[in-house]
Design a protein with these regions (language model features):
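Arg/Lys-rich, positively charged N-terminal/basic patches that mediate binding to nucleic acids
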Residues: 1-63
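Short amphipathic alpha-helical surface micro-motifs
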Residues: 1-5, 58, 69-75, 105-109
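Enriched for short, Lys/Arg-rich terminal
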Residues: 4-17, 93-148
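Acidic side chains
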Residues: 30, 44, 74-78, 136
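A short, surface-exposed loop/turn module that caps and links secondary-structure elements
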Residues: 55-100
Length: 148
């Protein structure tokens, strides 16, 4: 499985303009907590960055070298938080190998901010839907006030 991940990562990264990924302190705490339950989470997050987030926001070069954006049904904009320069998104379809047999319906959700001009992503929150139903809107508001 490790070899497959390395090959996929190489193929995907060759086709894209890289996005700069950062994590908030709260995200790091949430991630560390979930990592104890779901051991494959670190590799799964890397794969989600390459296979879902980057193709959705930046695109992938097709066989003719033309950049095409991926229509991802996995990513949703969170209403009332988006501006022209900043999009607050939620990644719903997150495949976690530690949750065998569930595929993209793992129940893990990631909330992040995408900066259009700088091509960067700040991860705000990660949670398991079995423990928490929806994203923390207060945390998003706090994040927005701290960066704007």
């Amino acid at each position: 499985m490790k070899r497959y991940f390395t090959v996929q990562k190489k193929l995907l990264s060759e086709n894209m303009n890289p996005i700069n990924f950062k994590e908030t302190q709260e995200f790091k705490k949430d991630f560390k907590k979930l990592l104890k339950k779901f051991r494959s989470l670190e590799e799964d997050l890397e794969m989600a960055k390459l296979a879902t987030i980057e193709p959705y926001h930046v695109g992938i070069k097709n066989k003719y070298g033309i950049l095409e954006k991926k229509d991802a049904s996995a990513i949703f904009l969170i209403p009332n938080f988006c501006t022209e320069e900043l999009k607050i998104c939620k990644l719903k379809k997150f495949a976690c190998r530690a949750l065998k047999g569930r595929g993209v319906k793992s129940g893990i959700r990631i909330t992040y901010a995408f900066y259009i001009k700088t091509n960067s992503v700040d991860f705000i929150e990660i949670y398991f839907k079995g423990e928490k139903e929806i994203e923390d809107k207060e945390r998003i508001k706090e994040y927005l006030t701290s960066v704007l």
